[in-house]
Design a protein with these regions (language model features):
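Glycine-rich beta-strand-centered segment in the early N-terminal region that forms part
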Residues: 65-80, 94-141
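Mid-domain Rossmann-like dinucleotide-binding core that forms the NAD(H)/NADP(H) cofactor-binding site
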Residues: 168-239
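N-terminal Sec-pathway targeting helices
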Residues: 1-18
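Glycine-rich phosphate-binding loop and adjacent beta-alpha segment
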Residues: 262-335, 369-370
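A structural motif shared across PLP-dependent enzymes of the aminotransferase-like
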Residues: 139-152
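A short acidic, Gly/Pro-enriched loop at the edge of an enzyme's catalytic core
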Residues: 246-254
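C-terminal capping/lid region of NAD(P)-dependent oxidoreductase domains
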Residues: 6, 328, 334-342, 350-370
Length: 370
């Protein structure tokens, strides 16, 4: 069986490499607009990059966007950073560069996704928002003073009880946790759920959401984060510096893995016979190699066809409904936003990303936009 699995994985990898070579030829001439645009007539500050790598981030004046007929113009008040941002900035794993259309240089120079702010203007077809409304959500190019977002896209009204920093923390981490627990993990009352990386951005949301679904939750974190994870409602906490959860006797119905630091076979050992293993967002930013965590995701997909256990990777899908649900849960006190650090300027985006990259953030890392 193992030999068959290995050959299947090899064939899949070969096909992926061939696909990549095709994309490589198509995108070899990929470039961007750095140095080619005229000086902005209506400038705003934004974090941009002309090449891959954290060292290439710059805070520059670019043209302030104007909303089209179906968009809202948002004055950004706060943004948050995610592992996704690190992958996007670094173009890592290398396979990702083909997916975003920039093998040599990034095609898109704008950065950031999670935001919260105030509507400054709306397009002629927009009726659900008006100038002055406070909103939050996700949009490419969020690391800026202004952004335009389709009014029916991933944007929702910000509840009055939330700060801009809290609201900016919700989008990717909150939706990933909600969809991981509800949709991919299919958590049911009474099930035993283990969350690896319980003190991070997604993990802090996932612990609380899994508890709201009636699960018996075990969180895995470091010694310094035990009290935090307990305060979020975890029934049990495993200190990974002292204990390896894959070597314990406990079996879990669902494992939500935000870290990806154990092999699939190790995780399968502590899954129930019909258990569900969910690799969240590709694992940590430390995954290296051409495919990064995608290799593990492919292995998981293959495993699932030969065993009763379900194994796979999930990426959050933008959802206005889920944004609204999460905001209501936070506003009502049913869900707590954990913020580790708040930086005070867009110029500190590189520092925020470096801190997140270390892998020890407690909850979310936020930046206030001046």
């Amino acid at each position: 069986m193992k030999r068959i699995l290995k050959w299947i994985v090899r064939i899949v990898l070969i096909l992926l490499v061939l696909a990549f070579l095709f994309v490589f030829v198509a995108y070899w001439r990929s470039t961007n607009d750095c140095g080619k645009t005229a000086a902005p007539t209506n400038p705003m500050k934004a974090v941009v990059r002309c090449d891959y790598g954290l060292a290439n981030l710059k805070l520059e004046d670019i043209e302030k966007p104007a909303p089209d007929a179906d968009q809202v113009l948002v004055k950004v008040r706060a943004v948050s950073v995610n592992p996704y941002d690190w992958h996007f900035i670094e173009g890592s794993p290398k396979f990702m560069r083909a997916m975003i259309g920039g093998l040599r240089k990034p095609k898109d120079i704008r950065l950031g996704v999670d935001f919260a702010g105030t509507v400054e203007g709306v397009g002629k077809n927009v009726t659900q928002y008006k100038a002055g409304d406070e909103v939050f959500g996700g949009s490419t190019g969020a690391f800026a003073q202004y952004l335009c977002r389709r009014a029916t896209g991933a944007v929702a009204p910000k509840p009055a009880g939330l700060t801009f920093e809290q609201a900016a923390s919700i989008n990717i981490a909150g939706i990933t946790a909600l969809q991981g627990v509800r949709d991919k993990g299919k958590v049911q009352p009474g099930q035993k759920v283990l969350i690896n990386g319980a003190s991070g951005g997604v993990g802090t949301f996932a612990v609380q959401i899994a508890k709201s679904y009636g699960a018996d939750v075990t969180g895995v974190c470091s010694t310094r984060n035990i009290e935090l994870v307990q305060s979020l409602g975890a029934d049990h906490v495993i200190d990974y510096t002292k204990e390896d959860f894959t070597k314990g006797d406990e079996k879990y119905d669902v494992i939500l893995d935000n870290v990806g630091n154990h092999s699939l076979s190790e995780c399968r050992r502590v899954l129930t016979p019909n258990g569900n293993y969910v690799l969240i967002g590709g694992g940590s930013a430390n995954e290296q190699g051409f495919l990064g965590a995608l290799g593990k995701a492919l292995n998981a997909a293959v495993y699932s066809h030969f065993v009763k256990q379900k194994m796979g990777m999930m990426m959050a899908q933008p959802s206005t409904q889920d944004l609204t649900l999460l905001a209501e849960m936070v506003a009502s006190g049913k869900l707590k936003v954990v913020i580790d650090r708040t930086y005070k300027s867009l110029s500190e985006v590189p520092d925020a990303i470096r801190y997140l990259e270390q892998g020890h953030a407690r909850g979310k890392v936020v930046i206030t936009v001046e």
